[in-house]
């Protein structure tokens, strides 16, 4: 008989955590009796789930933690979501969750219960899966996944620490993420497991072929795929390119994504007169054609955990240049996928200048990536080994 496994997540809107979850389910669905419980049953990644996964939605106010503003369509949902968000921002998430839990029946009968997305700060209207699994699920063993840098994402609070201590295991998606939480909570050392993200590489390659584009053949084409938020710091990449002088003529930079920083980035482009060098492409559900066509994937983030786009680029033979973040050296330099630079505008400038001045470095790295074999056997094996050890 297959062991019963409950995985709790907020929603399946497009994002790194959601893509990793869909890929994990594709790899483990035949080995366990899996129920995926979503706070809000919506999002583009719903269509990527295998048929053997039972997908349910909570029947309580926890659903508002899974909704974004556009999901709340009825007047009732808009009002209640606003009320819970307001309580969270004024008094803290624990008070909102206490109210949400009043109508939530306890679930039981599972060998393992997994909270797949971490919390943010105590007043961030985000997460809640840790609390749900800890307080509203009965299971033999409980596991919390960590997809962020614990010390830098706002999660390093007494409330979150107490929650993590209540779990039987913590699954960090990279060694860097694991090291970050252990630096704050060393007592969790015996509970920590490294479980890398699954990626479904064959699907990535197929989608790249389906969405193929032709970029400027006489240029070094550089692409960034990111939400345009402050932590992604895409504006710094544009500032670095403004400092390249005559080397600007050798490149074209494509920014795929949208967000609150878009207007500021447009201002930097205009001020630096980079309109012919930088193209804002907007959000794309399928950026893989651009990634494959580019000579370089650029990650200019102030902070990152283990971005899925690194593996996506590597399996498409596109080298990566990233600022130094918690997992960058582990995932990019140690793997041979590319280069890591100082986390600053000047560090980005130097890294770009080196690669633009010596394009053979990019060509040789791409050839190397083409020799590698990419599959999810290691990541799926780590997940299964963790469950077997508990």
Regions found by a protein language model. Name each.
Residues 360-390:
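A charged, aromatic-enriched C-terminal amphipathic alpha-helix characteristic of glycosyltransferases
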Residues 266-282:
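Nucleotide-activated donor-binding/catalytic signature segment of Leloir-type glycosyltransferases, i.e.
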Residues 154-155, 179-183, 193-219, 289:
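Acidic anion/phosphate-binding donor-loop and adjacent secondary structure
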Residues 18-23, 220-243, 253, 260-266:
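A conserved mid-protein helix/loop that constitutes part of the nucleotide-sugar donor-binding site
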Residues 7-14, 27-94:
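N-terminal strand-loop element at the rim of the active site
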Residues 334-345, 354-359:
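Conserved acidic donor-binding segment of nucleotide-sugar-dependent glycosyltransferases
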């Amino acid at each position: 008989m297959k062991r019963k496994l409950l995985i709790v997540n907020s929603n399946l809107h497009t994002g790194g955590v959601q893509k990793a979850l869909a890929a994990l389910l594709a790899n483990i669905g035949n080995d366990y009796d899996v129920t995926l419980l979503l706070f809000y049953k919506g999002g583009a990644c719903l269509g990527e789930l295998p048929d053997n996964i039972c997908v349910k939605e909570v029947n309580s106010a926890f659903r508002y933690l899974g909704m974004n503003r556009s999901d709340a369509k009825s007047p009732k949902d808009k009002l209640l979501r606003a009320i819970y968000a307001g309580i969270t921002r004024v008094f803290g998430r624990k008070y909102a969750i206490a109210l949400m839990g009043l109508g939530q029946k306890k679930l039981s009968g599972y060998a393992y219960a997994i909270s797949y997305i971490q919390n943010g700060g105590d007043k961030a209207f985000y997460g809640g899966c840790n609390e749900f699994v800890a307080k509203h699920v009965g299971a033999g063993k409980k596991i919390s996944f960590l997809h962020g840098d614990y010390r830098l994402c706002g999660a390093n609070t007494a409330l979150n620490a107490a929650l993590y201590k209540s779990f039987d295991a913590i699954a960090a998606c990279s060694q860097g993420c694991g090291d970050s939480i252990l630096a704050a909570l060393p007592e969790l050392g015996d509970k920590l497991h490294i479980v890398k993200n699954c990626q479904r590489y064959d699907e990535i390659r197929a989608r790249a072929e389906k969405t193929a584009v032709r970029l400027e053949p006489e240029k070094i084409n550089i692409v960034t795929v990111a939400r345009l938020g402050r932590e992604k710091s895409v504006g710094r990449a544009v500032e670095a390119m403004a400092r390249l002088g005559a080397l600007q003529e050798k490149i074209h930079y494509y920014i795929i994504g949208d967000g609150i920083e878009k207007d500021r980035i447009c201002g930097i482009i205009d001020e630096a007169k980079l309109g012919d060098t930088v193209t804002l492409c907007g959000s794309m559900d399928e950026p893989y054609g651009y990634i494959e066509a580019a000579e370089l994937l650029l990650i200019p983030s102030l902070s990152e955990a283990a971005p899925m786009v690194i593996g996506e680029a590597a399996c498409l033979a596109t080298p990566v240049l990233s600022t130094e973040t918690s997992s960058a050296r582990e995932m990019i330099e140690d793997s041979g996928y590319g280069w890591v630079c100082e986390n600053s505008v000047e560090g980005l400038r130097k890294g770009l200048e080196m690669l633009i001045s010596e394009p053979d470095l990019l060509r040789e790295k791409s050839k190397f990536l083409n020799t590698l074999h990419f599959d999810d056997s290691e990541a799926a094996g780590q997940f299964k080994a963790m469950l077997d050890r508990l």
